[in-house]
Amino acid sequence: MEQRHSLAGNCDDGEKSEREAQGFEHRTCMDSGDPSFGQNDPPTILPITAPKTYDSLTSQDMPETLTDTQALHEEQFHLLDQNGQPIQYDLQSLGNSTAQMTGMEQVAIPQEPFADEHSPQDISEEKPTGVRADVLEDSTSNYGLRSPASLVLPKKAGARLVEEPLLAPLQPLSCNTPMWACRLRSCEKIGDSYRGYCVSETELESVLTFHKQQTQTVWGTRQSPSPAKPATRLMWKSQYVPYDGIPFVNAGSRAVVMECQYGPRRKGFQLKKISEQESRSCHLYKATCPARIYIKKVQKFPEYRVPTDPQIDRKIIRLEQEKAFTMLKKNLMDAGGVLRWYVQLPTQQAHQYHESETPGVPLSPSPFPMSPLEEEEAIVRDENCALPSRLHPQVAHKIQELVSQGVGQVYAVRKQLRKFVERELFKPDEIPERHNLSYFPTVNDIKNHIHEVQKSLRTGDVVYNSEIIPATLQWTTDSGNILRETVTVTFAEGNLLGEPIPSKMGTSQTQTAVSPEPLSSFPPKIFTHFQALKLQPRLSSPDGSQALVSVDSHASSSPPGLVDTVGNAEVDNHSVLLGQSQNPGTDTCLTQDNSTSSSTGHLPESVPNPVAEDQLLEGEDVEDAGNPEGSVNRTLLGDVQTVPIQIIDSRPVLVEESLSKNQVKQETNEPTLSTEAKTFLDCKKISAT
């Protein structure tokens, strides 16, 4: 049942000048249950002191005080204006967390002037006056308020507000919301953090201190705003400031960023020493805590507020925004405005990797005891997430998928994640803001996840799944089985796709042509890193066949003597050919100066699929004299990266270097073998005998 209250406010004309000289006004409070109420008897006076200004329509925000020692039971109060007319009001409860903690209430009073209507006005001072009524003791009075209340004095109709009343949270907070989060205005939860704003530096310092005490964490400033010229760009929202229909400008060039003491280590003399020690001891990448505090100072202009009702047409809101911007640009210097400090504070669950291995560094502080609901929420999240992360499970799975495909660059992964979230996870109207770290992780978060996935792949905890490879990279056999072999890839010119290529040994081999479409999906890094023909060690497929890998992107970058098993072959990147061998009974290694060495005497003729080329030697000569058995020294060209290409044919796959155009024409006109081929065949006959 809604109660109607009244307060009688009377002023003694004889003492009016003296009261105004002292800057206070005296009002009266009457009990409607008193039998003398409404009669000529003087009412009982309760002192309420409030400062008054002489150039404002209303008084400023200063606490007023009511005193009483006895609680009233069901009394009603009436509020009277200076003319003795009653003013009705409704007792309403504040819908924010601060009001729930303090038990404060708010009184809504109709907009009617108390003071003289001819008094001067100032837009910057036309804000509601909140009159706090706290219970005090008065031995001579029998009246008082049962619970504290906040009386809001009226303002003149049509005037804009500079300081809007304490707004309700953007979304209802759960019962397990931390106390430090309840102190933020318009608080909302974003992932593992809470965001709100403060209206003064004192309030900001109080919230930060309370947060550090409850979470028992230590923070260091990573970034602070620079003393640049004042910002003039008008904005409605940003990475740190949510949209609330009020335009603003940034009060600093950058936001304040604070990192946990277990966060990333920064540049410095000590860091160089530590990096050298870790490089000597071959330490792997160490994950660091991703928890951060963000503080952004802005200047808001509430008098240019636009409606935020979602039922209003967007075109109308857009027109209102343009009109507000136009007016604000003209009066930006005289617009005034209010300052706000938007703060985003992480919870205890946002802290990770606090295990310390460095001597002399204090161990991770014990976490602040959580409520049962917080513990239950943390347990559920740990069960649902494969990796310890504050990221959304689908985002974490996407990182694992990208790393399994070979994408290890941090910024490449971040680009793919943003596309995944904005195009696949959410509709265009439901995309979360970029500051939601659950869907838009930081670079440090991505580094930690890449490290965890790579470690799991090495240890075998995460099995490589070929089903997540793009279809353009999947090669299968005739039966449809996916092959995981690495194959020889050689760029050649002078032959059409599918055209039979005669070999130097006089046998015609049918070439299996591969269209260049699969190459478009290769990372460009592969072709820039492989400057020469590089061959992997032989790998055995399930059916016993052997395969090699060879990638060459530029013919000019190849060694000057790059040849095939017999003669010279020009290598280019016009086509990709995969050939089948007709039992070449040699295993030959080539040096840079075209020297060849045969080891056919050690390979029996019964071996079905000997490899024509095993390794390419660069800058080294074959030392036959030092090897009594005649074996050949083989050297890899640095680090070789495997390419996840699948074989279409299940038969053995070998390298078939193509010939240049001139050589093809010469061999088509001259069926006889060259002297080099004859020499090769003679060596083969001798080894067979």
Swiss-Prot record:
<keyword id="KW-0010">Activator</keyword>
<feature type="region of interest" description="Disordered">
    <location>
        <begin position="541"/>
        <end position="609"/>
    </location>
</feature>
<dbReference type="GO" id="GO:0045944">
    <property type="term" value="P:positive regulation of transcription by RNA polymerase II"/>
</dbReference>
<dbReference type="Pfam" id="PF15299">
    <property type="entry name" value="ALS2CR8"/>
</dbReference>
<keyword id="KW-0804">Transcription</keyword>
<dbReference type="GO" id="GO:0003677">
    <property type="term" value="F:DNA binding"/>
</dbReference>
<protein>
    <recommendedName>
        <fullName>Calcium-responsive transcription factor</fullName>
    </recommendedName>
</protein>
<keyword id="KW-0539">Nucleus</keyword>
<keyword id="KW-0805">Transcription regulation</keyword>
<dbReference type="GO" id="GO:0005634">
    <property type="term" value="C:nucleus"/>
</dbReference>
<dbReference type="GO" id="GO:0071277">
    <property type="term" value="P:cellular response to calcium ion"/>
</dbReference>
<feature type="compositionally biased region" description="Basic and acidic residues">
    <location>
        <begin position="13"/>
        <end position="29"/>
    </location>
</feature>
<feature type="region of interest" description="Disordered">
    <location>
        <begin position="1"/>
        <end position="46"/>
    </location>
</feature>
<dbReference type="GO" id="GO:0000978">
    <property type="term" value="F:RNA polymerase II cis-regulatory region sequence-specific DNA binding"/>
</dbReference>
<keyword id="KW-0238">DNA-binding</keyword>
<dbReference type="GO" id="GO:0001652">
    <property type="term" value="C:granular component"/>
</dbReference>
<feature type="compositionally biased region" description="Polar residues">
    <location>
        <begin position="541"/>
        <end position="559"/>
    </location>
</feature>
<dbReference type="InterPro" id="IPR029309">
    <property type="entry name" value="CaRF"/>
</dbReference>
<comment type="function">
    <text>Acts as a transcriptional activator that mediates the calcium- and neuron-selective induction of BDNF exon III transcription. Binds to the consensus calcium-response element CaRE1 5'-CTATTTCGAG-3' sequence.</text>
</comment>
<dbReference type="GO" id="GO:0001228">
    <property type="term" value="F:DNA-binding transcription activator activity, RNA polymerase II-specific"/>
</dbReference>
<feature type="compositionally biased region" description="Polar residues">
    <location>
        <begin position="578"/>
        <end position="601"/>
    </location>
</feature>
